[in-house]
């Protein structure tokens, strides 16, 4: 790429449409909000301060049940709180999928003999679902 690069907005818009055409309609509609063509030099020279019309979407809530790049509060807190503790078994009170996702993160690298002084490879979960947490899940314990 050089400094005299020309921004072909029409080409980029067609490429975005081509990518979105591979998704089902509902998914394409949601993803379209996150894709946009950068404005050319002319728009910046005319005083436009935004480089793209789409804006930042990282501060909106995730859709429950959908894996995102950002992860979730559960996986983040598990990694921060339990990540450094390698010499005890962790019991996770949450869904199996959440437990596995948070268990498989890179902060689970460890040094030690599994089952003796390191229990990182073991993932125990009560498989609590939302209804168990709201209405009491003591029978599952």
From Swiss-Prot:
Binds 1 [8Fe-7S] cluster per heterodimer. Binds 1 [7Fe-Mo-9S-C-homocitryl] cluster per subunit. The keyword Membrane does not apply. Keywords: ATP-binding, Iron, Iron-sulfur, Metal-binding, Molybdenum, Nitrogen fixation, Nucleotide-binding, Oxidoreductase. [8Fe-7S] cluster binds at residues 72, 98. It catalyses: N2 + 8 reduced [2Fe-2S]-[ferredoxin] + 16 ATP + 16 H2O = H2 + 8 oxidized [2Fe-2S]-[ferredoxin] + 2 NH4(+) + 16 ADP + 16 phosphate + 6 H(+). The keyword Nucleotide-binding applies. Its cofactor is [8Fe-7S] cluster; [7Fe-Mo-9S-C-homocitryl] cluster. Coiled coil: none annotated. One of its GO terms (biological process) is nitrogen fixation. GO terms for molecular function: ATP binding; iron-sulfur cluster binding; metal ion binding; nitrogenase activity. Its EC number is 1.18.6.1. It holds the Pfam family Oxidored_nitro. It comes from the Bacteria. Tetramer of two alpha and two beta chains. Forms complex with the iron protein (nitrogenase component 2). Belongs to the NifD/NifK/NifE/NifN family. This molybdenum-iron protein is part of the nitrogenase complex that catalyzes the key enzymatic reactions in nitrogen fixation. This is Nitrogenase molybdenum-iron protein alpha chain. It comes from Rhizobium leguminosarum bv. trifolii.
